[in-house]
């Protein structure tokens, strides 16, 4: 096996080694058909079986009820920023958005191009390091409350999802399949798969079936009804991403399911935060109640030392530690496939850097 390093990139994510090795073994000849999975038709019986199993596994592992339709859609999370208001506000009404960070803000701005989307709370004044402790009033005729479960850039995450008088729409991209979902409160739950589940190029979307309707004034490709009717095969799908998603879902199931990975997420992030909090060299700006378990942001005493930290990390076996360009600093993304040994190794490196620059 070639040398592997610890990949802390925010996305595309690190993938389980067992999944990569399995895909490598099948790459040239998928199930004895003499072709790669990259080459086979999305209408073939072999791929149809993969596709159907992926949808079923996705629904089973996250315990989505039967009244939710799983969809595998192109365009990642960005396309959902538009599809959600185009469908849920097609016949009027308003929507409430909690602006918890850059990703929630992007969704809000797109929704405002489509319909009456209101920002009911913003964390901008705190530098997006907090979340609302109480739910603000909702606008009249509100159809849904939109929130981003976890903000990868600033590193904030909801510990508990709010209860509202309207259903929730949750962007769960960066903590998908690391925690349970309160389905009884939801209208749509979605996420780009590139954080925890597969290579980039796909969104896994769950839509409550009673909300799947054909709206004549919405382009057909942007309706959930068209994709549901075609069983997520309305256009030629990204077969490789679906194949890899299938393998990662099997790996999640074989590893103990979401309950196992939630426990792991708490343990891994807890180790790193505990070291940062007791260090005189590193600092995290997010209050403990709002800290992300999947994207840990921190900084050293100066921007120059931040840069040196992540530049010198790669030769030591670590990738992807540079903070987002809008925030700077350092960021360690700890998704499901990151072993606890990777976090322990990172802490060892952090201790070495701190001692050297003390």
Which residues make up each language-model segment?
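Conserved N-terminal alpha-helix of the aminotransferase class I/II PLP-enzyme fold
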Residues: 34-83, 87, 102, 110
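Active-site phosphate-binding strand-loop segment of PLP-dependent enzymes
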Residues: 11, 111, 123-177
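Conserved PLP-binding catalytic core of the aspartate aminotransferase-like
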Residues: 282-313
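Active-site C-terminal subdomain of aminotransferase-like
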Residues: 193-273, 287, 356-358
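PLP-dependent enzyme catalytic core of the Aspartate aminotransferase-like
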Residues: 1-5, 315, 328-358
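Conserved active-site segment immediately N-terminal to the catalytic lysine
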Residues: 169, 183-194
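PLP-dependent aminotransferase-like
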Residues: 78-143
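A glycine-/small-polar-enriched, mobile loop at the entrance of the PLP active site in fold-type I
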Residues: 4-55
């Amino acid at each position: 096996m070639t040398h592997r390093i610890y990949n802390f990139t925010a996305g595309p994510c690190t993938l389980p080694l067992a999944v990569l090795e399995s895909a490598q073994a099948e790459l040239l000849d998928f199930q004895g058909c003499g072709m790669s999975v990259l080459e086979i038709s999305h209408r073939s019986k072999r791929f149809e079986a993969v596709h159907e199993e992926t949808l079923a596994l996705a629904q089973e592992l996250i315990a989505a009820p039967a009244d939710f339709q799983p969809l595998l859609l192109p365009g990642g999370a960005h396309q959902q920023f538009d599809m959600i208001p185009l469908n849920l506000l097609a016949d009027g009404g308003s929507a409430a958005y909690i602006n918890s960070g850059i990703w929630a803000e992007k969704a809000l701005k797109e929704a405002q191009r489509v319909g009456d989307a209101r920002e009911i709370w913003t964390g901008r004044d705190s530098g997006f390091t907090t979340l609302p402790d109480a739910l603000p009033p909702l606008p009249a005729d509100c159809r849904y409350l939109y929130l981003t479960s976890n903000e990868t850039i600033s590193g904030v995450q909801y510990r508990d999802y709010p209860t509202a008088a309207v259903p929730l729409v949750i962007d769960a991209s960066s903590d998908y399949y690391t925690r349970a979902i309160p389905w009884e409160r939801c209208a749509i739950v979605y996420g780009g798969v590139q954080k925890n589940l597969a290579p980039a190029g796909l969104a896994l979307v769950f839509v409550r079936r009673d909300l799947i309707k054909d709206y004549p004034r919405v382009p057909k490709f942007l309706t959930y009804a068209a994709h549901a009717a075609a069983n997520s095969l309305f256009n030629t799908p990204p077969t490789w991403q679906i194949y890899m998603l299938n393998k990662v879902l099997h790996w999640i199931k074989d590893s103990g399911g979401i309950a196992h990975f939630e426990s792991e997420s708490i343990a891994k992030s807890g180790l790193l935060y505990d070291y940062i909090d007791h260090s005189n060299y590193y600092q995290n700006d997010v209050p403990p109640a709002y800290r992300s378990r999947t994207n840990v942001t921190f900084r050293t005493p100066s921007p120059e030392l931040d840069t040196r930290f992540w530049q010198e990390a790669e030769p030591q076996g670590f990738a992807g530690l540079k903070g987002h360009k809008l925030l700077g600093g350092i960021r360690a993304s700890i998704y499901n496939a990151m072993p606890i040994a990777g976090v322990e190794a990172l802490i060892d490196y952090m201790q070495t850097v701190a001692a050297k620059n003390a």
